[in-house]
Amino acid sequence: MVVLCHGFPELAFSWRHQVLALAEAGYHVLAPDQRGYGGSDRPAAVDAYTVTELSADLVGLLDDVGSQQAALVGHDFGAVVAWTAPLLHPDRFSAVAGLSLPPVPRPKVPTTQAFRKVFGDNFFYILYFQEPGPADAELAEDPATTLRRLFATPSADDVAAALRMLTPGPEGFLARIPEPGGLPGWINQQDFDFYVEEFTRTEFTGALNWYRCFDRNWELTAAPPAATIDAPALFIGGTDDATLAYTPRHRAREVATGDYREVMIKGAGHWLTEECPHDVTRALLEFLTDPIVDQRIRSSTR
């Protein structure tokens, strides 16, 4: 059993390439729209989106299909959930993989305080997302523009773009991302239109509420049932992913203390499942079919 957790602003649809490949390789695959997204519930209360609730959703899925354990794979914010769920429910996840975001230790201060210490007076999108209202309205005004700009987020080596994203000022988030003038080569119009239709229907508040739980998550994970992840763990990243610039990847083994591995895809950006689906699928299958990992997964399903 493999459970796939999408990120922001994504959907279960974002895993469409991997679902087929994993199923053809013999795995049972669950790829839900997570709470706040797509066809799943969108509770109004911000506290409904804590990492404990999101992790409990995954356990509930396993219970629903009668599976005691699963390998857990997450991308972007889905990787945050994937790295946290084995700490909260260590008996339910036999292996874990995170895409674009590696496992990082819990900061010494609440997460938004840690971000403010790093970014100071500069603009940082996660801090902008904290206040209900402004970001919700900005992203929902024109979902096609929102998604087109987010999917075209520049790579880490685009210094001018990085400066635009950080410069203090009254403008919101999207104005800092240049209009790309078209779709990136990794997504066609039909697939893009599906995203637009879904986010036009649901808007972005449920998705943004995940970000508004950062500090509450910090409180809730102070003393999890497991202090570290001892299950086999894999991080898959893109060498051109701008988000890695502010992620302490060098501390990953403080969290994943068992069999931890990394695969960096040369030239890849942030949207790995769609930008380089074959590379991602190959890395996942090499991990899942490794004799050590495979034995653990198979023994957990008996």
PLM regions with names:
Residues 37-73, 77-260:
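Flexible "cap/lid" subdomain of the alpha/beta-hydrolase fold that forms the substrate-access gate
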